[in-house]
Amino acid sequence: MANEIKEIQVHSIPEFMQQILAFEYEGDCTVYFRGESKDHKGTAFQPSIYRKLKHLEKEHLIYREMQRFNNHEFTEDRSAFDKLSRMQHYLAPTRLIDFSEDALTALYFALATRKTCDDAIVYVTAVANEKIKYYDSDAVSVISNLAKLPLDNDDIREKSKRAIADDANKAMLKSNRIDEYKNCKSTDFLLHEIKEEKSYFSHIIDPQHIFSAQFVKPKLTNTRIYGQKGAFLLFGLNFDDVKSHIPIIQYENNAPVLLDNILIQHPIKKILKLKISCKIDLTHLKKLGVTTPYIYTGMDKVSEHLKKISE
């Protein structure tokens, strides 16, 4: 099933806020925002780990190398998701994409890295509350720990994302999919990784979670996440192609649509796409108190900002 995504161009901050206040949706939802510096169209909701095949092939190495060289940064992180969320804010390729609870924060991100006078984009999304997960959710642990496994493994095939996807794919076709997946060898390797953070985790994984994108509220221990009022969409594996991300948006007849069906599991119920014209820039946000220190509360970014405005 696909739902049309409405596109509206805005030329001022009041117009931007007016469109958000007029955004309507059905059901019990929370509104989250995502800012992008340009219109990426069908790849707008694509995690960075999928933008280059080499990144995906080395995801398990990136995950470990980031910690090997920066172990002191991860001392408070207890789970794979905690570590991925910290890596995301240091621009490492991950299977996360950022959202914010704050519309002006999303607008800042859309404008701060805009390099041309093309429209920047802010996506306004209605996320079903019943499907929002917390950082310690079992489904979140299942997907996050995929990052520790190689895409392919010539030595032990079952210890790979491809084997996990193949086995989960077959199990999904069965009426007793959870029991079916429980008996797969690849499940043992994934469970081994999960039990590093949850020793009590039972030998039960719903294969549907493997092929889902979960909306997650993180712990606010990271100052960047706290300052940006952040949340994440965490991507599992694509049911049809393990090398591609789970599609959320696609274009039909040059118009964007929101995908949602049994094989594309995600919690986003509605999207409004606001195209930010060049008449809006960071000086307008500055008048509202939204500057670099408002977004990046760390001492490095604050000092960098103060140095810049003092020159």
Protein language model regions, located:
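Catalytic-core elements of nucleic-acid end-processing and repair enzymes
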Residues: M1-E311
